[in-house]
């Protein structure tokens, strides 16, 4: 056993986590990010699939690395051939931007116009839909969902982990009520700004486009924010039009890293399989 562990560790000695950043014209500041580069990246000729993984509220770009254990997860999934060797980009547009164009920041524009072009120019990543996916936890799940619904032509799959998709409004305990994106000039929570950005304002147009983004939705059964119900409602709505391209899992846990890490371990292989189907069908 000791030999196999050592051999496994050695096999992934060359996978790396590096820190990077790019200036965003949309935000007027930088977008810091951590980037996972798989073993063999430095000598590879063919471009790699890229996965964008978004953090939760009041966090930053290091959360998937430091708390989410993404390097170990990716290394192990790749070793088991459950995940194509991939570049994983973990950016931050700010601790409370919710990845939308809101009252304070144009974070959605920043991702599309600044982040994606930077990554695809600097890193050896694919630039086609079948080579690009997105996932996120809580606020990041909210963001991953919105990006998938509004720009389905960009993503081959999405991971929606414990998504903070409160319909019609967030609970009093939600960080969203304190976010500058959803606060008016008087400092009060702006219900119209929340409603405008929420996935419910995007899903009809998504369905009309007809381009399906397969989605893995997962939440904890003891989530104190009621997300297990919100996620179930999302699943049921998507199930009406993409029955074979949406999954929902409820696991034992709350709104915490045990659930978020489990979501990545379970969700990334499924997302990968969906992207591979698209890849082969081109």
Per-range role (PLM):
Residues 12-282:
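Non-catalytic cap/lid and distal C-terminal segments of serine-dependent acyl enzymes
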Residues 1-7:
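Bacterial N-terminal signal peptides
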């Amino acid at each position: 056993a000791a030999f196999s562990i050592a051999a496994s560790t050695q096999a992934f000695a060359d996978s790396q986590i590096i820190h990077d950043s790019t200036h965003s014209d949309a935000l007027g500041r930088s977008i810091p990010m951590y980037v996972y580069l798989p073993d063999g990246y430095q000598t590879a000729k063919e471009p790699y699939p890229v996965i964008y993984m978004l953090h939760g509220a009041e966090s930053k770009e290091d959360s998937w690395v430091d708390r989410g254990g993404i390097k170990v997860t990716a290394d192990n999934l790749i070793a088991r051939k459950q995940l194509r060797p991939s570049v994983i980009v973990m950016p931050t547009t700010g601790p409370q931007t919710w990845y939308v164009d809101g009252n304070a920041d144009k974070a959605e524009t920043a991702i599309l116009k600044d982040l994606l072009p930077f990554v695809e120019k600097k890193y050896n990543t694919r630039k086609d839909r079948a080579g690009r996916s997105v996932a996120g936890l809580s606020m990041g799940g909210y963001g991953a969902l919105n990006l998938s619904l509004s720009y389905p032509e960009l993503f081959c799959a999405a991971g929606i982990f414990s998504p903070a998709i409160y319909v019609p409004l967030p609970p009093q305990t939600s960080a969203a009520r304190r976010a500058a994106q959803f606060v008016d000039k008087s400092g009060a929570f702006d219900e119209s700004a929340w409603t405008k950005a929420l996935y419910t304002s995007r899903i009809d147009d998504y369905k009309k486009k007809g381009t399906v983004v397969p989605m893995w939705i997962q939440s904890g059964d003891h989530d104190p924010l009621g997300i297990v119900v919100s996620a179930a409602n999302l699943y049921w709505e998507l199930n009406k039009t993409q029955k074979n391209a949406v999954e929902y899992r409820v696991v034992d846990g709350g709104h915490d890293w045990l659930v978020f890490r489990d979501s990545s371990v379970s969700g990334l292989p499924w997302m990968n399989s969906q992207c591979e189907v698209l890849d082969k069908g081109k």
